[in-house]
Amino acid sequence: MERSALSFWVRSPGKGEIERVALPDPGPDDVVVRTLYSGISRGTESLVFEGRVPAGQRDLMRAPFQEGDFPGPVKYGYLNVGIVEEGASALVGRTVFCLYPHQTRYVVPASAVTPVPEDVPPGRAILAGTVETAVNALWDAAPLVGDRIAVVGAGMVGCSVAAVLAGLPGARVQLVDVDTSRAPVAEALGVGFAVPDDAEGDCDLVVHASASEAGLARSLELLAPEGEVLELSWYGDRRVAVPLGEHFHSRRLTVRGSQVGAVSPSRRSRRTHADRLALALRLLAAPAFDALITGEAGFTELPRLMPPLASGALPALCHRIVYDPVEEAALVQRHRP
């Protein structure tokens, strides 16, 4: 009997569809996973949905289980939580996280899934990929006890960084964003909040994640002498001016890039990608992370949901996608050739 599933594809910039796909038979080292939830990483997936991945960055932007190529047709995504239905006996029945796109079922090597700890709800575990980005960023930044820190940009990545920093003893952590509706999120995470003009300065470290030229300029202004901006923003195909005049050199400021594709050099010889992801999942035992999930919709709603999410008409941090097995079975029958 042929195995099949339904997946979400970006057919062309700004247009998404749900398609039936055939699944391969699992090999001896594979698992079959039924998806419970997936998450839309709004910043990155908006770039993909709108066809704004720069030609020179397309190889770097590929997701681990992406199919197709930019700008489309392409199946993209990397925040997926499901239950193992077939495979190694130690994994069958376990809830797992995988860097897989939006699809109802899939077959992957067992090494590609990470068990979700029992004290982490499956619906929260979709944040693991973004919290992993935060972990890697803070391995890069290496903040110290008592540091004065600002996180500029209260999107999904910025909020994840702030959530992890909230546990740093003696630190002053402030989330900075032009959108005052992010203030309750900051409160839930246990950090301060300010609009850019009111942000506290004299920072040892500023993590910039707003993907805006104004945000980067303000990040530099908030630094103390010899402070550092850690740049986490992904600008896609936009060119951004960096204000290196005025006091940049005399104050000996630093702007450093960080990217989750490789483990931070500070840990690379001692931690693997799997170690980093497992740590992110353990951190998600904290209920405060629920504040990052700001919306929910069914899988079949993805084609109509992505345009307003990508344009910003529907504000969101992480939008959670829910998979209904009964609905899936009916849709698979409907999509049969």
List PLM regions with ranges:
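A short acidic, Gly/Pro-enriched loop at the edge of an enzyme's catalytic core
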Residues: 199-206
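A structural motif shared across PLP-dependent enzymes of the aminotransferase-like
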Residues: 97-110
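C-terminal hydrophobic helical "lid"/dimerization subdomain
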Residues: 3, 271-337
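Glycine-rich phosphate-binding loop and adjacent beta-alpha segment
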Residues: 217-282, 323-337
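A generic alpha-to-beta junction signature in SAM-dependent methyltransferases
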Residues: 142-143, 223-224, 313
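Mid-domain Rossmann-like dinucleotide-binding core that forms the NAD(H)/NADP(H) cofactor-binding site
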Residues: 121-196
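Glycine-rich beta-strand-centered segment in the early N-terminal region that forms part
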Residues: 24-40, 48-100
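Helix N-cap at the beta1-alpha1 junction of Rossmann-like dinucleotide-binding domains, i.e.
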Residues: 180-182, 213, 236
